[in-house]
Amino acid sequence: MKHLSIFGSTGSIGQQTLKIVRSLPHLFNVVALASYGNNKDLFIEQIREFSPSIVSVYDEQLYFEIRKEFPEIQAFLREEGLMAAATAEEIDMVVAASSGVVALPAIIEAMKSGKVLALANKEVLVSAGEIIKEFAKQYQTEIFPVDSEHNALYQCLEGRNALEVKKLLLTASGGPLLHKTKEELAHVTVQDVLKHPIWHMGAKITVDSSTLVNKGLEIIEAYWLFGLENAEIDAVIHPQSLIHGMVEFLDGTVLSVMNPPNMLFPIQHVLTTPKRYPAPHKGINFSIKQTLEFFPIDEERFPSIGLARQVLKNKGSSGPFFNAANEVLVQRFLAEEIAWCDILDKLTRLMENYRVFACTSLEDVLAVDEEARALAQEI
């Protein structure tokens, strides 16, 4: 039985993780739950159903409610709670399903404590990939990617000779604005952007999907996850989202992972690896006609891919700056302060004017994160 700690349990990935736990109850024990959002009722329901021994919240009122209703549970606030949920002795695996870098210090402590890391938080690797890799090497941390694309690449690469890999290829659905003209893009609304044709995700990642910043972040994430210095990392539009990642080898052979666009597939793989179990979710129906399409990404229309490549070239502080600046610009778009087109325009300007420096500590990362947020709020 695996003993789990779940960061971001009320978010999309957190809820789906608990769905897998619910479907395979003999395999898992939920030791800790951490919530950053405002979904108090859902979090209380999760506590009642899964009976964790540790909970962490950011809302002070909810903290006192939990202490009153569940006196037997160790309840914590904010950073102290994340640390407890990351390092408790009985925990085997930490599922990092939160967004942003708020959980970064706790994730590092989990690695130091010898936990297996199920990483669904791409911002952590984008902002602190070099630091995470150093800690993973030092503490021999197993890191399993939960993102569907990186999970697919992981499965394709497992047991393979890294020197034989030519290219890692991530797929992108193209997002909700794939077929919009340049003129139409100038007038898209928040409601337009949040209507994703394939995936049901949180607002921030749905906006990132529309700008393809999400794919840029994933290119950076793939670099730090797999460390294949000689392999090219690229992305391609695949509207059906049935193939999630591909690995091309030196002989031209391509391996891919296929499943319906449902995060339950990669989540179950990570939670149950190295074994496989019957799933409550259905696979691809090959008895009906299926179409697989692939298109190159128009990098002039979507400069996010080029910006991501620049981040990988510069490394250092460019990763946390890129991530934090984009996050604020997305928040401003969702608040209807700026237009959709402004996200990439302003992000490009911020990146062009930013002077990169070596980023060697957690404190450096958090300082850059704070600076980028301030600049992105002002531009």
From Swiss-Prot:
Q: Which residues bind Mn(2+)?
A: 147, 149, 218
Single annotated GO MF: 1-deoxy-D-xylulose-5-phosphate reductoisomerase activity
Which keywords accompany this UniProt record? Isoprene biosynthesis, Manganese, Metal-binding, NADP, Oxidoreductase
Where, by residue number, does 1-deoxy-D-xylulose 5-phosphate bind? 122, 148-149, 173, 196, 209, 214-215, 218
Which reactions is this enzyme annotated as catalysing? 2-C-methyl-D-erythritol 4-phosphate + NADP(+) = 1-deoxy-D-xylulose 5-phosphate + NADPH + H(+)
- So which domain of life are we looking at? Bacteria
Pfam family, any one: DXP_redisom_C
Top EC class, one word: oxidoreductase
Cofactors that this protein relies on: Mg(2+); Mn(2+)
User: Which chain positions lie within coiled-coil regions?
Assistant: none
GO BP term (any one)? isopentenyl diphosphate biosynthetic process, methylerythritol 4-phosphate pathway involved in terpenoid biosynthetic process
**Which residue windows are transmembrane per the record?**
none
In which pathway does this enzyme or protein participate?
Answer: Isoprenoid biosynthesis; isopentenyl diphosphate biosynthesis via DXP pathway; isopentenyl diphosphate from 1-deoxy-D-xylulose 5-phosphate: step 1/6
Where do the annotations place NADPH binding? 10-13, 39, 121, 123, 202
**Do you know which InterPro entries this protein is assigned to?**
DXP_reductoisomerase, DXP_reductoisomerase_C, DXP_reductoisomerase_N, DXPR_C, DXPR_C_sf, NAD(P)-bd_dom_sf
**EC number(s) per UniProt?**
1.1.1.267
Q: PANTHER family annotated for this entry?
A: 1-DEOXY-D-XYLULOSE 5-PHOSPHATE REDUCTOISOMERASE, 1-DEOXY-D-XYLULOSE 5-PHOSPHATE REDUCTOISOMERASE, CHLOROPLASTIC
- HAMAP family, alphabetized: DXP_reductoisom (MF_00183)
Task: State what this protein does.
Answer: Catalyzes the NADPH-dependent rearrangement and reduction of 1-deoxy-D-xylulose-5-phosphate (DXP) to 2-C-methyl-D-erythritol 4-phosphate (MEP).
Q: Which family does it belong to?
A: Belongs to the DXR family.
UniProt name for this protein: 1-deoxy-D-xylulose 5-phosphate reductoisomerase
Q: Which organism is it from?
A: Chlamydia felis (strain Fe/C-56) (Chlamydophila felis)
**Gene field:** dxr
